[in-house]
Amino acid sequence: MQELQEKKNQSVGMLTQTYRPSPDALLNPLADPTFKTLFTDASPEAHNALTCFLTDIIGKEVSDVELQPNELSGEAVTDKQSEFDINCKIDGKVVNIEVQGMNNDDHYGKRVEYHVAHIYNHYVFKGMNWLEAPQAFQISVLNFIFDEAENDCINYYMLRNQNGRRIAGMLNVIFMELPKIISLPNDYSLLTPNQMWGKFFLYASNSEKQDFVNELAKHNRGIQMAVTVLNNISQDEINWYRETRYWMSVSDKKSMISSAEDRGIKKGLEQGLQQGLEQGIQQAVIENAKILLADGKYTASEISKLLHIPIESFSVSE
């Protein structure tokens, strides 16, 4: 009975407590749950925003966007499963969209290659005419730099040979690296449509950048729709609860990584000191062996057995 009452109190508390920092605060599209809701909300504006975003990022006009389940199982129980932020179909294409804030263990490239192959495998079924096979796209909005050596902020990857000729263009990966977009001018006339989206993701929730965001919205219909959706979903307390929980989990993960790194550094220092001590002792043993050998009372073989070190470590053959 007491347990039921506690759960009831927690539910009431969640509904009555506000997580919104101020009455006009906006959700952050870079938070996983907000990004998903922004493009999958049951409103025509969200659908139009997603359609326009795909058109701008792929570089071709798209229509008839159809949302798909965002979880794909493997063919075998041992296969990795895929869970996407957004999964959708458009004419002749299947698209997975992700927003990613951290490159855990520098393995994001491997994860993405698996995802795009998994999508393609899922939608190409037995007996399908290869002419009907859909192109697969994996689009990632990255809040970290994936490739330091690449200057472009939006990069397109596909299977090509050493001369740049592609095979069939069926597996496609697109990375939008937001840290590279920050340095671009905050002038809509100097930005491409997909760069405008990058600026929107970066500044949509920033109260000091709202004039610029509204300027982007005037010149990009998709961003105009996204601004409308963001304003609407920011009125819903449950969305603030989800975003708050998300940022808490991000902070916890960063703290765990930082703590693990600190422990690793400390352990490394301890191991280094121990290794240095051992090396010092070993060097002293070698010096003693050389003295004994020079004294002539013992043979090199006898010294080696006595001090448990190889002959070559203290005796130079002439």
Language-model regions, residue ranges each:
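Generic secondary-structure boundary/loop-capping signal
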Residues: D32-K36, G74, V116, G127, ...
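Short intrinsically disordered coil segments
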Residues: C153-R160, S189-W197, R245-W247
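Non-catalytic, well-ordered alpha-helical scaffold segments
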Residues: D32-P33, N48-T51, K110, A136, ...
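Short, charged alpha-helical interaction segments and adjacent helix-coil junctions
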Residues: Q2-L26, D91, V95-Q100, L202-E318
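Accessory alpha/beta interaction modules
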Residues: M1-V173, I182-L184, S259
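An acidic, glycine-/histidine-flanked metal-binding catalytic module
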Residues: G169, I174-K218, Q224, V229
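Generic structural signal for hydrophobic core residues of well-folded globular domains
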Residues: L38, A42, I57, P179, ...
